[in-house]
């Protein structure tokens, strides 16, 4: 049975309104006031776009980042890669966004990265860029063909924080997600390194 949705007060921003970000933001917009920002023009069905990262950060208490983390074409999944050297994703876009978000943030802001990164990357390369705001890693387990449905009906929600505690930022995210979910998913909280 679907829950009746109602707009809550927590303002939200989605930075990166591509295939993943737009569909997730449209689901969030059924429950929360939300704005989106993307370098490419978008036309979402139920939320407004802003013209800058600064406007997105100023609007929101929770800022989601859904930026691409491209990988080497040899690792696209078409062929086995066990014989190839290990290669990481390219985090340039995410790093640029975090640096800009940091300029306009303070400790009242929770920045949530949903982009794909390898274990250890958040602590080693990304979180140090965000000195003014709080940070959580929250990768989505979503199939690209059914993003909106998968987002509202997850099997589990994964949240990574500095210490892996289920209090503080993790609790804030759990409370944020509950009114949007059409099911009762399992919430798995760990550190950024897990």
Question: Where are the language model's segments positioned?
Answer:
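Conserved NAD(P)H cofactor-binding loop of Rossmann-fold oxidoreductase domains
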Residues: 67-68
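Alpha-helix C-terminal capping/helix-to-coil transition sites in glycosyltransferase folds
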Residues: 58-59, 153
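N-terminal Rossmann-like NAD(P) cofactor-binding module of classical short-chain dehydrogenase/reductase
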Residues: 63-64
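Internal alpha-helical scaffold of NAD(P)-dependent oxidoreductase catalytic cores
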Residues: 5, 104, 124-138, 142-143, ...
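Nucleotide donor/acceptor-binding cores
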Residues: 9-10, 109, 155
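NAD(P)+-binding Rossmann beta1-loop-alpha1 motif at the extreme N-terminus of oxidoreductases
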Residues: 1-58
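Rossmann-like NAD(P)(H) cofactor-binding subdomain of soluble oxidoreductases
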Residues: 71-147
